[in-house]
């Protein structure tokens, strides 16, 4: 697949810290799909997404976002993407509505456009009753939702999420999953890491399994089952089998 035909194309992505964290990883996410990246702790999931989002410079490899070289033209690439980590960073002294309007201003969005969009985002995440309260008193889950709303205010085409459901209660998780599903149905592309395999199983069009910095399996759930001889198993059992095989081969 050509870079122009995909939302995200990663080739040979490599990063070393004290050890090799990401090992010549190749990854393609198709336009309009929901892609879940799963793997054990320390597998390289977050490091991979941080390099894709332009927050960490790779030692080697390339990243293309809708055909744009994200390493040589990071400004153009970042205009098309949103990044939300599992540790939300927001301005605590602002209310959710003020924060979204502030972020919209950074993107140069006219208030006449940004204010209705901000109200819609807050309502979709169940934050409308709290839109005039300062964020400093919010739980981590509420802060996570404010951060997500802020990341989406410029209507990005590629949404990059690192454990977006961490710290959320069942109601908040449903809000987030509903919003992400709506975005994909409207043509956006989502790539996210998650340890909640049930979420990957239910929401993702395709799933990538990463272990020791390498993509060891990829496909729809049906394809993963067929390729690995686990025709009726859950993603959890399949994941454990794949990771154990990779560990034994290491």
Language-model regions, residue ranges each:
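Conserved ABC ATPase "signature" region
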Residues: 101, 105, 112-130
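Helix-to-loop junction immediately C-terminal to a conserved catalytic motif
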Residues: 53
């Amino acid at each position: 697949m050509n870079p122009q035909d995909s939302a995200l194309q990663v080739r040979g992505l490599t990063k070393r810290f004290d050890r090799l964290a990401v090992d010549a990883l190749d990854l393609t996410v198709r336009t309009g799909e929901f892609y879940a990246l799963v793997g054990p702790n320390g597998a390289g999931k977050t490091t991979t997404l941080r390099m894709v989002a332009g927050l960490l410079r790779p030692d080697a490899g390339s990243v293309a976002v809708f055909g744009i070289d994200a390493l040589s033209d990071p400004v153009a690439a970042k205009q098309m993407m949103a990044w939300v980590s599992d540790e939300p960073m927001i301005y605590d002294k602002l209310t959710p509505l003020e924060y979204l309007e502030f972020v919209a201003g950074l993107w140069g969005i006219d208030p006449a456009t940004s204010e209705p969009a901000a109200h819609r985002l807050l309502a979709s995440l169940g934050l409308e009753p709290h839109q005039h309260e300062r964020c400093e008193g919010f739980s981590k889950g509420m802060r996570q939702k404010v951060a997500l709303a802020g990341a989406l205010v410029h209507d990005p085409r590629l949404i990059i999420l690192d454990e977006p459901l961490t710290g959320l209660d069942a109601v908040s998780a449903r809000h987030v999953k509903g919003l992400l599903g709506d975005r994909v149905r409207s043509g956006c592309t989502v790539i996210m890491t998650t340890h909640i395999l049930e979420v990957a199983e239910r929401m993702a069009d395709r799933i990538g399994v990463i272990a020791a910095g390498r993509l060891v399996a990829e496909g729809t759930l049906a394809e993963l089952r067929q390729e690995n001889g686990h025709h009726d198993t859950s993603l959890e059992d399949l994941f454990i089998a794949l990771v154990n095989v990779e560990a034994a081969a290491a």
